[in-house]
């Protein structure tokens, strides 16, 4: 088989619900919360997470950015490109970055520095997956889904060359799938 399940659909749903409860508690007094999804990989995680956050007295808005450091490779190139920026101001608002995976930490660090210059009231991150062993820089992750080993993960929005995003679980892409 070309992939091995790391986290099942049920495990992911349970963890995302837990994160939603934490975020609901932490932002219950916020007036304006902007959830910034990093495309494309975080779209499934963000969709499920948003439905797990219940803030009836908060103006919750969704924004998206597209940032890339991969291309069609299985490891980060280290070159960060902003392909789509925010469409509205985040000044004075509470901002929560929704990211699929942190490998080296370089992309998230760069993004946090960029958004911090836009003067949000607060800036935090919710990350589905972190490769702790691969971190080159420490980045603050307030809401963590799962720590994972140094393997290439697919499914639940994460891809390899635009394939496998639709899988309902998170799996390891085996080397025979991409090495020729």
Swiss-Prot record:
Substrates-to-products reaction catalysed: IMP + diphosphate = hypoxanthine + 5-phospho-alpha-D-ribose 1-diphosphate; GMP + diphosphate = guanine + 5-phospho-alpha-D-ribose 1-diphosphate
Disulphide-bridged cysteine pairs: none
Natural source organism: Dictyostelium discoideum (Social amoeba)
Residues the entry annotates as binding GMP: 40, 99-107, 131, 159
Subcellular location: Cytoplasm
GO BP terms in the entry: GMP salvage; guanine salvage; hypoxanthine metabolic process; IMP salvage; purine ribonucleoside salvage
Pathway: Purine metabolism; IMP biosynthesis via salvage pathway; IMP from hypoxanthine: step 1/1
PANTHER family per UniProt: HYPOXANTHINE PHOSPHORIBOSYLTRANSFERASE (PTHR43340:SF1), HYPOXANTHINE-GUANINE PHOSPHORIBOSYLTRANSFERASE (PTHR43340)
List of residues binding Mg(2+): 159
Chief localization: cytoplasm
Pfam families: Pribosyltran (PF00156)
GO cellular component terms attached to this protein's record: cytosol
Catalytic site: 103
Cofactor binding mode and count: Binds 2 magnesium ions per subunit. The magnesium ions are essentially bound to the substrate and have few direct interactions with the protein.
Similarity field: Belongs to the purine/pyrimidine phosphoribosyltransferase family.
Name the record gives this protein: Hypoxanthine-guanine phosphoribosyltransferase
InterPro entries per the UniProt record, alphabetical: HGPRT, Hxn_phspho_trans, PRibTrfase_dom, PRTase-like
EC class (word): transferase
Record-level Gene Ontology MF annotations: guanine phosphoribosyltransferase activity; hypoxanthine phosphoribosyltransferase activity; magnesium ion binding; nucleotide binding
Enzyme Commission (EC) number: 2.4.2.8
UniProt KW keywords: Cytoplasm, Glycosyltransferase, Magnesium, Metal-binding, Nucleotide-binding, Purine salvage, Transferase
Keyword Chloroplast: no
Function of the molecule: Converts guanine to guanosine monophosphate, and hypoxanthine to inosine monophosphate. Transfers the 5-phosphoribosyl group from 5-phosphoribosylpyrophosphate onto the purine. Plays a central role in the generation of purine nucleotides through the purine salvage pathway.
